[in-house]
């Protein structure tokens, strides 16, 4: 029952952010994420400094299957970009908070994420890369602290 409630809250959060991003109509990036998880990544800019990102990853093997989903609200800081005086590129730090859910064969996992990262993009190209470190606090089925890391590439549609 507890897992169902947490999963329902997670899905409601995603639907809320998808409605906000739909009204924005710009700044949607789709791409790949490697390592934590490995799968598909999406990022939707809400304004110049705030974005919502998410990822979906699958792990399939003969004896084990899992589906990984996360969503984060991110704040981007422009001070590094201003210090380096980059003319044709953007290098920004970001941090935020979010949730992750891992659906497994035997034990579903629900946790809090606190991503800290760096994003780089060229002003004349619709591509962006990112690198992030993520302290994670799993709260279900048992409390556990861990670190994850990921790199990725996104193509921006608008």
What function would you assign to each model-found segment?
Residues 61-66, 123-158:
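Predominantly the C-terminal beta-signal and adjacent terminal strand-loop region
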Residues 46-48, 77-79, 103, 120-124, ...:
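Outer-membrane beta-barrel strand-turn architecture
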Residues 26-28, 34-36, 50, 65-69, ...:
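Residues that define the transmembrane beta-barrel architecture of outer-membrane proteins
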Residues 40, 49-52, 80-83, 124-127:
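Repeated loop/turn-to-beta-strand initiation elements of outer-membrane beta-barrel proteins
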Residues 32, 40-44, 71-75, 97-99, ...:
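Residues on the lipid-exposed face of transmembrane beta-strands in outer-membrane beta-barrel proteins
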Residues 19-60, 68:
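Short glycine/proline- and aromatic-enriched beta-strand/turn motifs that initiate or cap beta-hairpins
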Residues 34-38, 56-62, 75-77, 99-105, ...:
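Transmembrane beta-strands of outer-membrane beta-barrel pores
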Residues 1-25:
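Cleavable N-terminal export/targeting peptides
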């Amino acid at each position: 029952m507890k897992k169902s409630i947490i999963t329902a809250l997670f899905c409601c959060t995603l639907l809320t952010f998808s409605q906000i991003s739909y009204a924005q109509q710009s700044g949607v990036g789709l791409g790949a994420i490697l390592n934590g998880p490995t799968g598909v990544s999406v990022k939707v800019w809400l304004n110049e400094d705030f974005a919502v990102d998410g990822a979906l990853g699958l792990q399939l093997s003969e004896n084990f299957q899992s589906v990984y989903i996360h969503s984060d609200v991110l704040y981007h800081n422009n001070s590094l970009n201003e210090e380096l005086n980059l003319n044709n590129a953007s290098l920004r730090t970001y941090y935020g908070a979010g949730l992750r859910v891992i659906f497994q064969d035997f034990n579903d996992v629900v946790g809090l994420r606190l991503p800290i990262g760096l994003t780089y993009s060229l002003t004349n190209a619709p591509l962006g890369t990112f690198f992030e470190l993520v302290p994670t606090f799993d709260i279900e089925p048992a409390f556990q602290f861990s670190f994850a890391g990921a790199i990725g590439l996104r193509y921006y549609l608008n």
